[in-house]
């Protein structure tokens, strides 16, 4: 069974140049969606928007395909994970630090991402997927009984004594 999950990562430690580049790319993309006039948007973002969002006049963020995003683990004080976001005019893109995540990106496959700006801060919504085996038998089962005398009674399979709540 395939499981999908969206991880919300804040971009931290942005320099003024990186923030200006991301703001320019974000604003130019939104302007291109509204008017159709290209003020300098990365071409792959335009291709995705033409294909996916034919009727959208404004979007929540900039969609990023999985082949355009690169998330790697680095041993730095700023952040454990770094992402490379493609921007028009910068060869190779902009390397940004992702806020400390209790998530292991190496164990999952990265699908697509969305670059979002909220209150002047940038967030990267990364969608990941993984194939997991469905369990057919569980080791611990908890039964909850809602009653009139006791609000709730729970019994775990491995424990023989019930717990009374109420």
Predicted regions and their residues:
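Nucleic-acid substrate recognition interfaces
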Residues: 1-166
């Amino acid at each position: 069974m395939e499981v999908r999950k969206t991880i919300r990562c804040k971009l931290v430690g942005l320099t003024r140049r990186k923030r200006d580049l991301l703001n320019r790319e974000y604003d130019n993309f939104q302007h291109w969606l509204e008017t159709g006039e290209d003020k300098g948007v990365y071409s792959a973002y335009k291709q995705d928007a033409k294909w996916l969002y034919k009727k959208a006049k404004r979007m929540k963020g900039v969609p990023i395909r999985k082949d355009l995003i690169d998330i790697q683990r680095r041993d730095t004080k700023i952040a454990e994970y770094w992402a490379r976001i493609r921007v028009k005019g910068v060869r190779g893109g902009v390397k940004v630090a992702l806020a400390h995540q209790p998530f292991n990106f190496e164990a999952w496959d990265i699908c697509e991402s969305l670059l979002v700006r909220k209150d002047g801060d940038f967030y990267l919504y990364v969608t990941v997927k993984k194939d997991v085996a469905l369990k057919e038998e569980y080791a611990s089962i908890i039964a909850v009984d809602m009653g009139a005398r006791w609000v709730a009674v729970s019994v775990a399979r491995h424990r023989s004594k019930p717990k009374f709540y109420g």
